[in-house]
């Protein structure tokens, strides 16, 4: 219908809005189902040797237009290659949720850094949004919790993204937390390089 030339601009706009909202609803349902699967051990991981640098670059490219649309500077620092034994789908969901969250809450920039220390793969995603108070830094990883304050613009969402990301990190025998910083919001993912 959208491709039809006989559709008026108003109807085309309405149809595009409906399609966008349908996709958002579908994404929400899929996130809720994924979260439920992680809680009931129904989410099966398939560990494979993967170039995480390449996977991160591909995910970064998907989110770059969204960041640009919001006027955000999005930077990435990654080695040419960094191999680890991961579930590609699960890790992509973790990264996507961290970037979605950063884009929603950032004011001017998002910095992504991938590196390794010892036998750990580390990924940090930092943004300059309103700094989350120390007492809320564990709360935001609970399902359906969002940090809100009177000065923060209204941000759409359900509060399931960080809960799903942490659950997937734990299934990878890893961790996802906020680093101690009073200057910005930095989320740190730590996963074993090998399983």
State where each predicted segment sits.
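Short beta-strand/loop element within the Bergerat-fold HATPase_c
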Residues: 109-119
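Short conserved segment of the HATPase_c
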Residues: 132-144
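Short alpha-helical segment of the dimerization/phosphotransfer core of two-component systems
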Residues: 20-25
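Conserved catalytic submotifs in the C-terminal HATPase_c
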Residues: 46-51, 68, 73-82
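Helix-loop junction within the histidine kinase core
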Residues: 36-47
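Short alpha-helical Gxxx[C/S/T] motif in the catalytic ATP-binding
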Residues: 156, 161, 165
């Amino acid at each position: 219908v959208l491709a039809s030339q006989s559709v008026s601009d108003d109807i085309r706009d309405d149809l595009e809005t409906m399609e966008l909202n349908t996709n958002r609803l579908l994404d929400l349902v899929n996130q809720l189902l994924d979260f439920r699967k992680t809680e009931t051990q129904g989410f099966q991981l398939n560990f494979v040797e993967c170039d995480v640098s390449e996977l991160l670059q591909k995910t970064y490219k998907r989110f770059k237009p969204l960041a640009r649309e919001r006027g955000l500077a999005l930077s990435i620092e990654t080695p040419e290659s960094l191999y680890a034994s991961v579930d590609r789908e699960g890790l992509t969901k973790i990264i996507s949720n961290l970037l979605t969250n950063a884009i929603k809450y950032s004011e001017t920039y998002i910095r992504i850094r991938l590196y390794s220390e010892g036998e750990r793969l580390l990924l940090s995603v930092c943004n300059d949004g309103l700094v989350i108070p120390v007492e809320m830094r564990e709360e935001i990883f609970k399902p359906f919790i969002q940090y809100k304050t009177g000065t923060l613009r209204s941000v759409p969402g359900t509060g399931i993204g960080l809960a799903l990301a942490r659950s997937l990190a734990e299934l990878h025998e890893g961790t996802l937390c906020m680093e101690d910083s009073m200057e910005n919001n930095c989320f740190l993912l730590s996963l074993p390089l090998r399983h």
